[in-house]
Amino acid sequence: MNLLIVGLGNPGSNFLHTRHNVGFGLIDKLVMKNALSLRKAKNYEYADFNVDSRRIVLIKPLTYMNLSGNIFPCVFSKFYMKINNLLVVVDNVDLPLGKCRLRKVGGASTHNGLRSISESLGSTKYGRLYIGVGNNSAFGLKDFVLSKFNDSELVRVKNVFNFLSEEILGIDEFSFEHKIATINSSSF
């Protein structure tokens, strides 16, 4: 099974290391770990490579989070992918920092990036990898997800990226349930 991994985030250096950009962070880790470089297309960056005769495409949308769905007509066409190849990596404020959840399908909840994707695709039947970023009720939701991780939190997030960069490329139609168990039981 070919895999299209789309990490959500906001473009620009001012969003680096923010909670909302963990999807970008994991894509960056995968690019670095596999000695790749991102190439620029019209409204996204991508890297394309093979693992065990499977095509893996990594994507960072260059639209802002709320418009993430706009890239999919171009991406599916360019890379000959379909919705069943899609895995979206996204932040989740309902999960504690350092916890992850892999799902085959799901809803958008309060996440505007997922809502945009689901609207663009006309479906919610695509894979999601949620990365817990914690929650702080002292902040409003928008301010919290746009806040940067502190140093100790960033160490934990990097540990999550290290773990996921080992696990995520092995996801296929035969191993998905096993990967759900492995990833969902992890905590950093």
UniProtKB/Swiss-Prot annotation:
GO terms for cellular component: cytoplasm. It catalyses: an N-acyl-L-alpha-aminoacyl-tRNA + H2O = an N-acyl-L-amino acid + a tRNA + H(+). TRNA binds at residues 15, 64, 66, 112. Its EC number is 3.1.1.29. Keywords: Cytoplasm, Hydrolase, RNA-binding, tRNA-binding. Its main location: cytoplasm. Monomer. This is Peptidyl-tRNA hydrolase. It comes from Borrelia recurrentis (strain A1). The gene is pth.
